[in-house]
């Protein structure tokens, strides 16, 4: 089975690629990423030895998807994950729309063309900005980390997902 992951070098995309290859035999993974986020190049280097083909591209451009090989399944993990994107002057609402919604049209066209199934992932955009900005954070180098005494009794954190690849030297 061939799996195509958008945003393959991001936090979620790279973790999914690694997990799929570890948990199931007979799966090949390839993905596309615009490599704009911090850590993308690091994740690209970690995916290469696993056999993941990483293609530098942007799913907002239909032409970048047209040249990709067919897949049986698509996992759409590409998004602008910033909760504050388009709010408080952190980028425009149009840019947010293009990254998180308009690009989905191109992914759907790819799925239709190749008769591929689609797993559409959500982003932190579904959470209330007021509640997210009230979470206690600690500064960790050049990143933020949720304070261990935070208010999340359930859910998944980055620390749980990054088994061998910590994002922050504090872990």
Question: How should these model regions be labeled?
Answer:
Residues 1-171:
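N-terminal Rossmann-like NAD(P)+-binding domain of SDR-like oxidoreductases, especially those catalyzing
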């Amino acid at each position: 089975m061939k799996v195509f992951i958008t945003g393959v070098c991001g936090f979620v995309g790279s973790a999914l690629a690694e997990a799929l290859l570890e948990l199931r035999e007979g799966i090949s993974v390839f993905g596309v990423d615009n490599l704009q986020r911090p850590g993308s190049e690091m994740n690209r280097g970690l995916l290469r030895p696993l056999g993941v083909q990483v293609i530098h591209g942007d799913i907002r451009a239909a032409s970048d998807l047209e040249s990709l090989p067919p897949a049986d399944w698509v996992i759409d993990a590409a998004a602008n994950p910033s909760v504050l994107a388009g709010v408080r002057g952190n980028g425009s609402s149009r840019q947010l729309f293009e990254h998180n919604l308009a690009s989905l049209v191109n992914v759907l066209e790819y799925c239709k063309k190749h008769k591929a199934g689609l797993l559409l992932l959500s982003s932190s955009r579904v959470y209330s900005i007021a509640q997210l900005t009230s979470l206690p954070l600690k500064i960790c180098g050049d990143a933020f980390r949720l304070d261990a005494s935070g208010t999340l009794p359930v859910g998944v954190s980055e620390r749980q997902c990054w088994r061998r690849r910590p994002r922050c030297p504090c872990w």
